[in-house]
């Protein structure tokens, strides 16, 4: 690495929990060499960088930006656009930036309903005057909520994606090594839009559990069963998103008896992860025998699928911003409960 010009790096969090920044700091000894390869141009989570520090830079002067978090507020949107303008390479880092993640489950309701749930209807809410925050007045430093949570690629052009909630630390090191070498001219640029720090197959292909021909009558909550350490969790009645989720984490959750939650995003060719997961769950349902009447078979399948608690939060936990259908939100060109193709435009 001697003789290299230090590349400039920006890291920013939008609608995020901070876990992606922790993942960057959790890369072990590799962190010690980071400052030799990158000049930190902007990283407000870990140092006292201000908006003007970024705004005053020339456009395109930041070599690499890792942006984590969903686009929830007007300020998030403005920062995404600013960082896109200042950065040569913009990476959607982590599940929130990739697909909206848990914040995007808010897209199941209008903003007004969300505010009412938080400030008026909560079981522990004490708000006798019924004060509900409104749209900040013009010139207010408080950012307004957007009408929906967006992923980063729905508001600006994204060069690459690093999935995960948060990205696994070993994979973060791989991505930093790759992009550092790319910026130094030592390796070719990946294909535009490439998913970095992940595998080409699904979590199931990384999972050591045995996929047997087991059928279930209903799906269980984790507290209802102690799974054995050999058999596929789906076959034991536990919801697992492995069949539809991109690999790269090493199947960390299934290895310890917890179903995959889908944080590495959809596998290759999966357009809607919730639809693919629904099909995977239906495939393990014990739908009776061929001697039963069609109505009886349908009723058994319906009962089994109804045992999946919180279907939206289970099947679209990390992907609601990219869901083909989003309940409760009328969209251009579609009936209530759908989002049209132009719905992400602001």
Where are these regions (language model features)?
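Iron-sulfur (Fe-S) cluster-binding modules
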Residues: 1-66, 77, 81-89, 108, ...
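Short glycine-rich anion-binding loops that position phosphate/pyrophosphate groups of nucleotides
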Residues: 69-72, 96-98, 167
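Extracytoplasmic/secreted cell-surface and envelope-processing proteins
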Residues: 75-76, 100
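Short gly/pro/ser/thr-enriched loop/turn and capping motifs at secondary-structure boundaries
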Residues: 96-103, 121-122
């Amino acid at each position: 690495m001697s003789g290299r010009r230090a590349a400039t790096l920006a890291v920013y969090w939008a609608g995020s929990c901070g876990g992606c920044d922790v993942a960057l700091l959790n890369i072990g000894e590799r962190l010690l060499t980071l400052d030799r390869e990158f000049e930190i141009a902007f990283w407000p989570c870990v140092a006292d960088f201000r908006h003007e520090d970024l705004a005053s830079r020339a456009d395109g002067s930041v070599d690499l930006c890792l942006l984590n978090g969903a686009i929830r507020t007007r300020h998030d949107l403005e920062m995404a656009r600013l960082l896109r303008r200042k950065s040569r390479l913009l990476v959607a880092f982590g599940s929130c930036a990739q697909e909206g993640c848990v914040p995007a489950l808010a897209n199941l309701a209008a903003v007004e309903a969300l505010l009412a749930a938080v400030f008026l209807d909560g079981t522990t809410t004490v708000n006798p005057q019924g004060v509900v925050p409104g749209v900040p007045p013009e010139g207010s430093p408080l950012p307004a909520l957007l009408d929906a949570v967006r992923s980063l690629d729905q508001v600006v052009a994204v060069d690459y994606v690093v999935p995960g909630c948060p990205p696994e630390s070993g994979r973060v090191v791989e991505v930093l090594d790759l992009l550092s070498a790319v910026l130094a001219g030592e390796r070719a640029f990946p294909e535009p839009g490439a998913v970095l720090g992940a595998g080409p197959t699904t979590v199931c292909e990384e999972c050591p559990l045995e996929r047997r021909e087991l059928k279930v009558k209903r799906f269980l909550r984790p507290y209802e069963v102690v799974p054995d350490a050999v058999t596929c969790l789906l076959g034991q009645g536990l919801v697992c998103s492995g069949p539809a989720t991109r690999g790269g984490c090493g199947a960390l959750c299934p290895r310890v008896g917890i179903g995959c939650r889908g944080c590495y995003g959809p596998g290759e060719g999966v357009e809607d992860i919730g639809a693919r997961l629904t099909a995977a769950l239906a495939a393990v349902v014990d739908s009776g025998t061929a001697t039963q009447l069609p109505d009886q078979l349908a009723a058994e399948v319906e009962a089994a699928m109804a045992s999946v608690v919180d279907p939206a939060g289970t099947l679209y936990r990390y992907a609601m911003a990219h869901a083909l259908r989003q309940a409760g939100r009328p969209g251009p060109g579609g009936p209530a409960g759908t989002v049209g193709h132009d719905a992400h435009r602001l």
